[in-house]
A protein has these predicted regions:
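Active-site-adjacent structural elements in enzyme catalytic cores
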Residues: 1-195
Length: 195
């Protein structure tokens, strides 16, 4: 599939197609959550490596997690400190999360709000998307549109002209992943944010 404008990326995502756009960390593959299996197939990804939900704001994500009032206050403090940004929180999943996002452990879900203007513009128009880094499973993230198009020819990739207009820069470093564990955080992957 060719590159697309921002409007074409939004339309493709809303139509259940896999798209790619830059984030503050590495470029993402993204799809509407009910179509998550398309990303697993494209990446040749095993089901023990879940996808995450990405949104334009924290408010868009709270319905996808469940916890008591005290836990939610702790989680919101983390998001107020680090979001938008390069921190993925793994929290207990609500019934709203499609099991296809985390087939091996549907009781949890990773959530993130990127600190990237164009990613948040797209997510603001599409709503929450299931995402992962743009790469084949087990390989390094792809950082350029041409590499993404070569590896994933059926994915609509945000056009270079759109990237230039927005001054797009990826850090190239993945997000930090922290999982909530009974009153505390367990860092599963150290990335751009240090906890």
């Amino acid at each position: 599939m060719p590159t697309g404008s921002l409007n074409e990326i939004v339309h493709a995502a809303l139509s259940g197609q896999v798209v790619s756009f830059p984030t503050d960390t590495v470029p993402a593959l993204a799809v509407s959550p009910p179509y998550s299996s398309l990303i697993f197939a494209a990446k040749k990804r095993t089901f023990d490596k879940p996808l995450i939900l990405m949104a334009a704001s924290a408010a868009d994500l709270w319905d996808y997690v469940k916890g008591n009032q005290e836990e939610r206050e702790i989680w919101q403090q983390m998001t107020e400190k680090y979001w938008p940004g390069s921190l993925t929180l793994v929290l207990p999943a609500s019934e709203k999360v499609p099991k296809a996002l985390n087939p091996k452990n549907p009781s949890t879900i990773g959530i993130r709000v990127p600190a990237h203007a164009i990613a948040r513009e797209i997510l603001g128009r599409t709503g929450v998307l299931a995402t992962t880094s743009a790469n084949l499973s087990g390989q390094e993230p792809l950082l350029t549109p041409s590499a993404i198009m070569t590896t994933f020819p059926s994915v609509t990739v945000l056009a270079s002209t759109e990237r230039q207009a927005w001054g797009i820069i990826n850090s190239g470093q993945p997000s930090t992943v922290a999982r909530w564990q009974c009153q505390g955080w367990d860092v599963l992957r150290q990335g751009a944010v240090f906890l």
